Amino acid sequence: MAEFETIIGLEVHAQLNTESKIFSTSATKFGSPPNSQTNPVCLGLPGALPVLNEFALEKAIMAGLAFGCDITLFTKFDRKNYFYPDLPKGYQISQFDKPICTGGGVTFTIKGEDSARYVRLTRIHLEEDAGKLIHSADPNIPQSYVDLNRAGTPLIEIVSEPDMRSSDEAYYYLNSLKSVLKYIRVSDCNMEEGSLRCDANVSIRPKGSDKFGTRVEIKNLNSFKAVKAAIDYEVEWQKEMALEGKTFQQQTKLWDSVANKTVTMRTKEMSHDYRYFPDPDLPVIILQKETVESVRSKLPELPNERKNRFVEKLGLPKYDAEVLTAEREVADYFEDALKVSGDAKKTSNWVKDEILGIVNKENITISEFSVSARRIGELVKLIADGKISGKIAKTVFEELLTSDKDAETIVTEKNLIVVRDDKEIERIVDEAIANNQDAVTKYKSGKDRALGAIVGYVMKVSKGKADPELVNQMLLEKLGPLPPKS
């Protein structure tokens, strides 16, 4: 059977989180009543002239710098002409031959792999969004309604080179791209609200060939899982067509998430079909290098850089670093807690396990989490300093969730500080040995797990306050080292 290679390129539209639209002063707030955020410019009324939103331009430059793009110092806007009910002007203001950013790329790692992969970018350009069509759910009322709140919302379109060879690569590429966009705070990337949308361009070719096959563009991909599923389905469909000797036209398809298949929408338009020409209402933009460098100075530490620092400087395992740096707010929370605790690994464990566990369960952001990073840092410091055990820490944590008290106050009020009185601990250890002779016998026959039962007895009697290290030390002194198994 013939073997094929999959070729994938992605086009991502990210809505920029500006307060007003790209060429007008209308607001961009999601969820407002239909057609309540419009003005003559986004309605396309005669005589209404566009004026570029400076903040949208800056955010586009910042995105380009974050992905290592070259910034075009001489750039312009073009009219992309097509007719659709949600496009009142009859054209979309976009960028054609002079995009604001060119080149660059996205670095990502596939789960379970150590080496990073890199997908080149073709360009990033600015454009305005179209409106939204809302179709009647009643088949007896065949009507559609137009909401132009979204018309004129600023977008950047991030176009990749056809460098991806599997749906897995596409999935992790998108996750990395989204992480960077959120880190630099140019977009909230909320797919449910439509602020991040993706189209996939998919083709196949015989392995070893350097010619591209017929391309299919897939739209209506409202999640990264949908992107992965749509690519997998389309690749199999194209392989079947090739093996049967059938051909097909370049086309646009929709992803049907109910039927789990791609459905033909129309034959694909080429760039000349849109009759691009420079927008006569908008002057060309001539950027100064100083302007670009000013934007560069505002860039935060990016996810990959931060992840590498957590591993190399803080000594965290790679997995911990990946979890902590996936979102900027989580990484900030961790570092703020670490400033207080001084113990990177213990702080990491608490943030990624206990705190993110609650955050994910309650479907909130870490910014909405009730316990501040400082208070968590204080709790972890008590553990690191040996003042409380991990078990007691969880009791303290439960109270932190429902009160404004700091960890040390809770520990003091409830008398939870670890017992370090050698004589008192030795008394309990002797009692544990005397009352757990079966465990002692198993330990002396080489079963190391038996020691846990004796330690558990000590911790129960001491209500979790005995110093675990001291308990283990005393037990080894009294029982001797673990003998080889008989």
Swiss-Prot record:
Keywords, A to Z, come to: ATP-binding, Ligase, Nucleotide-binding, Protein biosynthesis
Q: Which domain of life is it from?
A: Bacteria
Any idea which GO molecular function terms this record carries?
Answer: asparaginyl-tRNA synthase (glutamine-hydrolyzing) activity; ATP binding; glutaminyl-tRNA synthase (glutamine-hydrolyzing) activity
- What top-tier enzyme class does this entry carry? ligase
Specify one Pfam family: GatB_Yqey
Q: Is the keyword Protein biosynthesis in the record?
A: yes
GO terms under biological process: glutaminyl-tRNAGln biosynthesis via transamidation; translation
- Look up the EC number in the record and give it: 6.3.5.-
Q: Which InterPro entries match?
A: Asn/Gln-tRNA_amidoTrfase_suB/E (IPR017959), Asn/Gln-tRNA_Trfase_suB/E_cat (IPR006075), Asn/Gln_amidotransferase (IPR018027), Asn/Gln_tRNA_amidoTrase-B-like (IPR003789), GatB (IPR004413), GatB_C_1 (IPR042114), GatB_Yqey_C_2 (IPR023168), Gln-tRNA_amidoTrfase_suB_CS (IPR017958)
Kindly state which reaction or reactions the protein catalyses: L-glutamyl-tRNA(Gln) + L-glutamine + ATP + H2O = L-glutaminyl-tRNA(Gln) + L-glutamate + ADP + phosphate + H(+); L-aspartyl-tRNA(Asn) + L-glutamine + ATP + H2O = L-asparaginyl-tRNA(Asn) + L-glutamate + ADP + phosphate + 2 H(+)
Keyword Nucleotide-binding listed? yes
**Which proteins does it associate with, and in what oligomeric form?**
Heterotrimer of A, B and C subunits.
* NCBIfam families the UniProt entry points to: gatB (TIGR00133), PRK05477.1-2 (NF004012), PRK05477.1-4 (NF004014)
Tell me which family the UniProt entry assigns to this protein.
Answer: Belongs to the GatB/GatE family. GatB subfamily.
State the function annotated in the UniProt record.
Answer: Allows the formation of correctly charged Asn-tRNA(Asn) or Gln-tRNA(Gln) through the transamidation of misacylated Asp-tRNA(Asn) or Glu-tRNA(Gln) in organisms which lack either or both of asparaginyl-tRNA or glutaminyl-tRNA synthetases. The reaction takes place in the presence of glutamine and ATP through an activated phospho-Asp-tRNA(Asn) or phospho-Glu-tRNA(Gln).
What protein is this chain from? Aspartyl/glutamyl-tRNA(Asn/Gln) amidotransferase subunit B
Which species is this record about? Answer: Leptospira interrogans serogroup Icterohaemorrhagiae serovar copenhageni (strain Fiocruz L1-130)
- What taxonomic classification does the UniProt entry list for its organism? Bacteria, Pseudomonadati, Spirochaetota, Spirochaetia, Leptospirales
Gene name of this polypeptide:
gatB
